[in-house]
Each structure stands twice: as C-alpha cells, then as structure tokens.
C-alpha cells in the first residue's frame, strides 16, 4: 500500500529505528511499511495516525478511489 510514512518520518528527522520505538515495532517493520511490502494492521495504522496527527487516509493510499475514475 502506498503511504507517506517515509516523508512524515523524514520531516521529523527520525530514523526508522526511532520511529519503530515510537510504534513498538522493529526497524524492519517500519522499512517494510514504507516500501509497501507490508500493510500495517488497523491498530498500528491508528497508532501511526495519532503519532503524526493526520487522518489515516492522508497517510495511507489503499488504491480505492470510490469509483471516482470509473469509465462508463
């Protein structure tokens, strides 16, 4: 899943390890989420949202546009 996690982390000058500590996950988990190899659980997504003070949908892009771009 595409996301803004790397950008948000960089804006705070946090390493992946530092963000992992804030979220109680490993540096490897942060890397996997940032690169889209792993989708966070809903509780983790909420934790990320609270940490950065942004709605989940502004951090994560699930690729669903609600039919906005449907051809018909």
Predicted regions: what they are:
Residues 43-58:
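DNA major-groove recognition helix of helix-turn-helix/homeodomain DNA-binding modules
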Residues 50, 60-72:
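Short, charged recognition helix plus adjacent turn
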Residues 17, 28, 57:
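Key DNA-contact positions within bacterial/archaeal DNA-binding proteins
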Residues 3-22:
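Short basic helix-loop element that most often maps to the first helix and adjoining turn
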């Amino acid at each position: 899943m595409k996301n803004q996690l790397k950008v948000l982390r960089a804006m705070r000058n946090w390493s992946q390890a530092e963000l992992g500590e804030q979220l109680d996950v490993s540096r490897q988990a942060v890397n996997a989420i940032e690169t889209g190899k792993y989708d966070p659980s809903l509780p983790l997504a909420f934790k990320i949202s609270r940490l950065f003070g942004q709605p989940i949908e502004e951090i994560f892009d699930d690729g669903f546009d609600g039919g906005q771009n449907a051809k018909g």
